[in-house]
Amino acid sequence: EVIASQPVDPDLVISTLTQPQFHGAAHMYQKHMTQHMIDVIPRDWMKTVTNVFLLRHPARVISSFSKKYENPTLHDIGFQKQIELFRFLLDAGHNPVIVNSHDIIRFPEKTLKKLCSHLSLDFDPVMLCWDIGGSRYDGVWAKYWYGAVHRSSGFSEPEGTLPDLPKKLQSLEKRALSHY
């Protein structure tokens, strides 16, 4: 369903991702997940955009991911690929921004102001809230992943302590921590 909903030709996708204006907008936000950044697709296009890495503690990623995938692997949760992509950009002379999801949730205004400043964008307080429900830009995967966001109208309360993972996932957390 997801693959059928959009182009699969890498050149066409890259062309869309790097066009100067998207639907007339001067700036375009793109969310990429590491499992979509497969090795056979060229990465040079990443050098033409500003990259921000949003990190989340491995225990939180694993806890969330394991609700959708029965036995997630280190490859599935993407920490190794994040390091690889980050190093690719460093080697190309870029200095990608790293934002920890904990900071956005705990200090949304402060964190977004810093991010906007780094990206040479104006901060607008409207960034701190949104209408409940989905967006036409969500994509077909929204019904699988965006339930909590669709029920919200702003940033949630700060996250509590790290989740206790089942024993079978604790070694995965330990391996992921070395890449975090």
What are these regions (language model features)?
Residues D122-Y180:
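PAPS-dependent sulfotransferases, especially Golgi type II membrane carbohydrate sulfotransferases
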Residues E1, F53, A176-Y180:
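Generic hydrophobic, helix-prone segments enriched in Leu/Val/Ile
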Residues Q6-D11, H75, F79-Q82, P108-L112, ...:
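A structural signal for well-ordered alpha-helical scaffolds and beta->alpha junctions
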